[in-house]
Curated annotation (Swiss-Prot):
Main subcellular localisation: virion
Post-translational modification summary for this protein: In natural infection, inactive HA is matured into HA1 and HA2 outside the cell by one or more trypsin-like, arginine-specific endoprotease secreted by the bronchial epithelial cells. One identified protease that may be involved in this process is secreted in lungs by club cells.
Protein name: Hemagglutinin
Keyword Nuclease: no
Note: Major glycoprotein, comprises over 80% of the envelope proteins present in virus particle.
Job description of the protein: Binds to sialic acid-containing receptors on the cell surface, bringing about the attachment of the virus particle to the cell. Plays a major role in the determination of host range restriction and virulence. Class I viral fusion protein. Responsible for penetration of the virus into the cell cytoplasm by mediating the fusion of the membrane of the endocytosed virus particle with the endosomal membrane. Low pH in endosomes induce an irreversible conformational change in HA2, releasing the fusion hydrophobic peptide. Several trimers are required to form a competent fusion pore.
Protein's gene: HA
Keywords recorded for this protein, A-Z: Disulfide bond, Fusion of virus membrane with host endosomal membrane, Fusion of virus membrane with host membrane, Glycoprotein, Hemagglutinin, Host cell membrane, Host membrane, Host-virus interaction, Lipoprotein, Membrane, Palmitate, Transmembrane, Viral attachment to host cell, Viral envelope protein, Viral penetration into host cytoplasm, Virion, Virus entry into host cell
Glycosylation sites per record: 25, 59, 145, 166, 304, 333
Source organism per UniProt: Influenza B virus (strain B/Finland/151/1990)
């Protein structure tokens, strides 16, 4: 007779790493990881996802919308998640802006981080009667409005001295910027200043010297001195060539808090303000958004969660996402592999 000891077994290609025994062969495993492939970005399942700030504002960049360029004002949909599709927002097509002087490019990204965003229906300041006035409100042929007349950004008023009596140099003037949002939101107040060559500065403001500007709100104070001249003629988005430039900035005012702006000639006084509340998770991505996905991943786009873990590129992700691991994980669902039993000697 032949007597065999052991258990029934077959060759096992499955190896798992254990905490106590190192690598162990087992009879069966369940893979716990997947390696995603790149896909388009999508709407996040179970929540509203925002792509462009104003989807119905045609031919408008997010910076156009944030500054209130004529023809670029509309409703910004509420969203719990937002796609940062302009990593470095492109210029606004209304008037040449000196982007390197300020944080104006960050404004669309700041707004994107809020769940609810709306533009006020009223102006925060009566610009015509502001200190140093009376002023007429300047417009530009580079900013055509809905009737194709000259216009300017809805968030700012270009304060040009109204007559020769006040078209003179001035010491620093200060205007208080009240809080006008009605639901306790953060108030994002946009302001700026215009500068040009010496001839245009004298023509518009009666002073060709560099002008000083300061804003202060929520414990943050910012100072500027304008640059006079040295600008080549520049046209934005097919508009009229401009010898001047504008510098745009913003300040965030918390509920009930007043801000201040100290200025000389060339001020762009704040007008309509953004009222923003809630938080929206922001992730770098691309448009358009196609379909739905469990997870949005900066490197892979929209992912549907098929496994609890993933390998590959590690990057920011939002939603119901698998967890990144360096190496594949397996769950043993069989027994420890034993080699085929050896025959005992015949008796």
């Amino acid at each position: 007779d032949r007597i065999c000891t052991g258990i029934t077994s077959s060759n096992s290609p499955h190896v798992v790493k254990t905490a106590t025994q190192g690598e162990v062969n087992v009879t069966g495993v369940i893979p716990l990881t997947t390696t995603p492939t790149k896909s388009h970005f999508a709407n996040l399942k179970g929540t509203k996802t925002r792509g462009k700030l104003c989807p119905k504002c045609l031919n408008c960049t997010d910076l156009d919308v944030a500054l209130g360029r004529p023809k670029c004002t509309g409703t910004i949909p509420s969203a719990k998640a937002s796609i940062l599709h302009e990593v470095k927002p492109v210029t606004s097509g209304c008037f040449p802006i000196m982007h390197d002087r300020t944080k104006x490019r960050q404004l669309p990204n700041l707004l994107r981080g809020y769940e609810h965003i709306r533009l006020s229906t009223h102006n925060v300041i009566n610009a015509e009667k502001a200190p140093g006035g009376p002023y007429k409100i300047g417009t530009s042929g580079s900013c055509p409005n809905v009737t194709n007349g000259n216009g300017f950004f809805a968030t700012m008023a270009w304060a040009v001295p109204k007559n020769d009596n006040n078209k003179t140099a001035t010491n620093s003037l200060t205007v208080e910027v009240p809080y006008i949002c009605t639901e306790g939101e953060d108030q994002i107040t946009v302001w700026g200043f215009h500068s040009d060559n010496e001839i245009q500065m004298v023509k518009l403001y009666g002073d060709s010297k560099p002008q000083k500007f300061t804003s202060s709100a929520n414990g943050v104070t910012t100072h500027y001195v304008s640059q006079i001249g040295g600008f080549p003629n520049q046209a934005e988005d097919g508009g009229l060539p401009q010898s001047g430039r504008i510098v745009v900035d913003y300040m965030v005012q918390k509920s009930g808090k007043t801000g201040t702006i100290t200025y000389q000639r060339g001020i762009l006084l704040p007008q309509k303000v953004w009222c923003a509340s809630g938080r929206s998770k922001v992730i770098k991505g691309s448009l358009p958004l196609i379909g739905e996905a469990d997870c949005l991943h900066e490197k892979y786009g929209g992912l549907n969660k098929s496994k609890p873990y993933y390998t590959g590129e590690h990057a920011k992700a939002i939603g119901n996402c698998p967890i990144w691991v360096k190496t594949p994980l397996k769950l043993a669902n069989g027994t420890k592999y034993r080699p085929p039993a050896k025959l005992l000697k015949e008796r």
